[in-house]
């Protein structure tokens, strides 16, 4: 099989073996990283071993990052331990980013610990990519992420909270409710958002408390109001109504509360009438 490779604006057809030779023997870093890129796109598992060799031994960071990307595309778990090593030890930030992304594709319980460790990487892009990789892996990462909610570093707690909301495992709800008390506002913002995504009614009282707390950050309170709208629990109706009625002017918080109030009313109107537990008529608002 031959594949077309762009070389100095010329299209050159190269076979699989020619690409392997370029990868392993060319003195040009550009030729080597182009070979790695194309080998990943070709999807031939015979390229895995040469790409692992390059990932471990090539002195050029661009070549190593394309090797990491290619190994993720090929999806062979033989590359997992080598990608973990690159994630932990490679000095090149872009290589660590690509290794994290590749590990997210490969998945499996073995990659969870190194990815969670990378939430504490000195480079923010590595942290973000590791978080996205853990989200891609899904539920198998939940327990390790829950433990990370107690990490001393605020960015780790933020990333773990975000990831747990995206993964959607309700076993994280109790711990994220505790994160509503975190000293850092960014963690609390992620916590209210994630509780909305997790969609567990047990979070309703805690979210109401946050929304009603006038000493809390406005973004956190608005996030709590938005989450209540997602949960659509009738218990939030009166607190939302009181917040709006007591406001001197309608800002972002009150606007969000109003939207959530309407969502909950719409979702529960028939049940409320059947139970005859409310005297609120179905109006435009009140």
Per-range role (PLM):
Residues 27-28, 59-60, 91-92, 122-123, ...:
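Short inter-helical turns and helix N-cap capping residues of alpha-solenoid HEAT/ARM repeat scaffolds
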């Amino acid at each position: 099989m031959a594949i077309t490779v762009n070389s100095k604006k010329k299209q050159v057809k190269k076979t699989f073996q020619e690409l392997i030779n370029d990868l392993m023997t060319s003195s040009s870093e550009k030729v080597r990283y182009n070979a790695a890129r194309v080998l990943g796109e070709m999807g031939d598992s015979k390229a895995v071993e040469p790409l692992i060799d390059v990932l471990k031994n090539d002195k050029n960071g661009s070549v190593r990052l394309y090797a990491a990307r290619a190994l993720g595309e090929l999806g062979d778990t033989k590359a997992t331990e080598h990608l973990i090593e690159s994630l932990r030890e490679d000095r090149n930030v872009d290589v660590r980013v690509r290794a994290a992304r590749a590990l997210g594709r490969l998945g499996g319980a073995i990659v969870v610990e190194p990815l969670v460790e990378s939430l504490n990487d000195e480079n923010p892009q590595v942290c973000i990519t590791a978080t996205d990789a853990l989200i891609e892996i899904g539920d198998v990462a939940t327990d390790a992420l829950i433990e990370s909610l107690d990490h001393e570093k605020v960015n780790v707690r933020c990333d773990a909270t975000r990831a747990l909301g995206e993964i959607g495992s309700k076993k994280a709800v109790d711990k994220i409710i505790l994160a509503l008390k975190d000293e850092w506002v960014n963690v609390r913002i992620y916590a209210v958002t994630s509780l909305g995504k997790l969609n567990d009614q047990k979070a309703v009282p805690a979210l109401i408390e946050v929304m009603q707390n006038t000493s809390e950050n406005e973004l956190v309170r608005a996030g709590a109001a938005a989450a209540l709208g997602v949960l659509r629990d009738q218990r939030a109706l009166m607190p939302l109504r009181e917040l709006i009625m007591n406001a001197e002017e309608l800002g972002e918080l009150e606007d969000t509360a109003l939207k959530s109030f309407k969502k909950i009313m719409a979702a529960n109107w028939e049940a409320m009438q059947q139970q005859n537990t409310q005297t609120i008529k179905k109006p435009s608002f009140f």
